[in-house]
Each structure stands twice: as C-alpha cells, then as structure tokens.
C-alpha cells in the first residue's frame, strides 16, 4: 500500500468587514488528506504529495478581534512575531487601505503577497462572489509538481 497525501489550495479569508471580506490573493497549498498517520509538521507526512486543483475557503483569520488575539496568542508560532504589533496591523486594515499593504503573513515573507476584497455578508455570498474572481491554480504547476513527486517517490 503506497503512502500518499493530497494537497489542495485554500483561499484565506483574512478579515471580515461590514459588507465583505479581505482575502489573501494567492491560493496557498495545504495538506487535505492522507492514507497514513505519520504527521510531522502542518499535517505533512513526508510522503508522495498529489496536488489537486481544488480551492477551499479558509476563514481562519476572519474572526473578532478577541478571537484573533486568542488564536495568535496560542498559536505554535506565537514567538515568531510581535503579536500586539500584528494585531494592531490587522485591526487597522480596511476596505479603503488594504491595497497599500503587501507581505501580509506575520512571519513568512512572500507567503501572502497581497490582499483583495470580495463582497458578501454571508459565507454563501462570499463563496458565490469568489467564484467570479480570477483565482486559480496553475495547471502547469500542478502537472510539474505531481511529476516531480512521482519520480521522487517512485524509487524510494
């Protein structure tokens, strides 16, 4: 039985606003499923990864100020950045100024390159409106990465 893991891409909803959301413009790879239980870091099992072109809406950061403070204060990476400074940064981002910011991730440079805005008061409205945005996963990138993974793990 060959061990594999499946990776998809999420659209991180960064902040909920009155009439919509701010989201991270670039879709980010995450591990979705596996047939093994040998997790290492961030659900990565260090086995062959098959990337699929699925987008998942991830509301991880779209919380109240109190909830976000609790999240990042208890996060395993809470020593990797200044929590108070980042929370203040998050609080001050809004619909009129979000385009002024880049490299949004608290400690991984270029992971979250920039924000974009999507209208929608409910999750259903946000998803419906995100479908019309130009968010996609490069097919050539998927193919190349899947071929590399196949070759890498074929001879292990």
Tell me the role of every PLM-derived stretch.
Residues 1-156:
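Catalytic-site signature of metal-activated, phosphate-bearing donor transferases
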